Regions:
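Structural signature of beta-strand start/N-cap positions in the alpha/beta core
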Residues: 1, 24-25, 45, 73-75, ...
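N-terminal beta1-alpha1 cap of cysteine-dependent amidohydrolase-like domains
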Residues: 1-68, 79, 174-189
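Short gly/ser/thr-rich secondary-structure transition/capping motifs
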Residues: 27-33, 56, 104-107, 123-126, ...
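Cysteine-nucleophile active-site neighborhood
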Residues: 44-116, 180-182
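Histidine-centered divalent metal-coordination motifs
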Residues: 78, 127, 167
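Catalytic beta-strand/loop cores that center a nucleophilic Ser/Cys/Thr
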Residues: 110-158
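C-terminal and late-domain segments of enzyme folds
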Residues: 141-145, 149-155, 159-189
Length: 189
């Protein structure tokens, strides 16, 4: 079972749809309707933290759940990505340019969720906040960027935790299904 934390975003059920299409049983809970303890007691195989219209610290259990997930594979999307960065000490700051419904080419490290994806694939972005690159802690690797150097992907160096700033669940993102499939294959031999 995959646990999907809904940060009150319209894209949450796009994620639900894509993940279900990939054959996963998905349970959805709003970020203020379940505790971290209840999430962990469910023993999910994987966790996805959805996008949302606020900051990570306004996103209910999102940041504490990232800190508590341990070895449960976890993917953060947009706000979920920012929650991962925030949980490990990165700063979330205003982006130089607000990106609502705009695509950008994504350069990546071809590992983890990006394994086998084309370089510079187009991804849709809906955000006004970003992770400040000078604040990324040692245990986090930057895995993807825009041509201007904005962080579009991060990965924990020792835990199965990744985040993407863009929206793989949007039809406007090339290879979105494959990126999510790569996440679902974490820990599968």
């Amino acid at each position: 079972m995959l646990l999907l934390i809904d940060n009150y975003d319209s894209f949450t059920y796009n994620l639900y749809q894509y993940l279900s299409e990939l054959g996963v049983e998905v349970e959805v809970f709003r970020n203020d309707k379940i505790s971290v303890e209840d999430c962990l007691a469910m023993q999910p195989d994987k966790i996805v933290i959805s996008p949302g219209p606020c900051t990570p610290h306004e996103a209910g259990i999102s940041v504490p759940l990232v800190r508590s997930a341990g070895n449960i594979p976890l993917l953060g999307v947009c706000l979920g990505h920012q929650a991962i960065g925030s949980a490990f000490g990165a700063e979330v700051v205003q982006a130089g340019e607000i990106m609502h419904g705009k695509t950008s080419p994504i350069n990546h490290d071809n590992k983890g969720v990006f394994a086998g994806l084309a370089q510079d694939f187009d991804a849709i972005r809906y955000h006004s906040l970003v992770l400040e690159k000078t604040s990324i802690p040692d245990e986090i690797s930057v895995t993807a960027t825009t041509p201007s150097g904005l962080i579009m992907g991060i990965r924990h160096k020792n835990l199965p935790i990744e985040g993407v700033q863009f929206h793989p669940e949007s039809i406007m993102t090339e290879n979105g299904h494959q990126l999510l499939k790569n996440f679902l294959n974490f820990g599968v031999d």
